[in-house]
Amino acid sequence: MNTSLINQKNQTCIDTCNECAMMCEACCTECMSNTEMAGMMGRCMMKCRDCAMMCTMTAMMMARGSEYSKQMCEMCATICDACAMECEKMGNKMEACKECAEMCKKCAQECRNMMR
């Protein structure tokens, strides 16, 4: 991507959102593949899917300089926080959830930085 059109602060947030989306998808896939835990993982998987979608949309809107980028970052931070809380509940059972929670916290903070 031509980052000359995107300042470094925006690029950092875009990269973090994209990384978080991938981490959430990986966590969701890991949860689905764990048959003995599948029944307990429903909320975690739903939060991960919502978070992945929101992170992807936020990154795309920021990349094209949307006038709604700050609002998207605010919503993204909220959803990342919710996903992190849900993943933390399962973090002692699954490493993917623990890693996802940490990435979601990082993404929420980057999105909050964009609102300043």
Regions found by a protein language model. Give the residues of each.
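Amphipathic alpha-helical hairpins
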Residues: 1-116
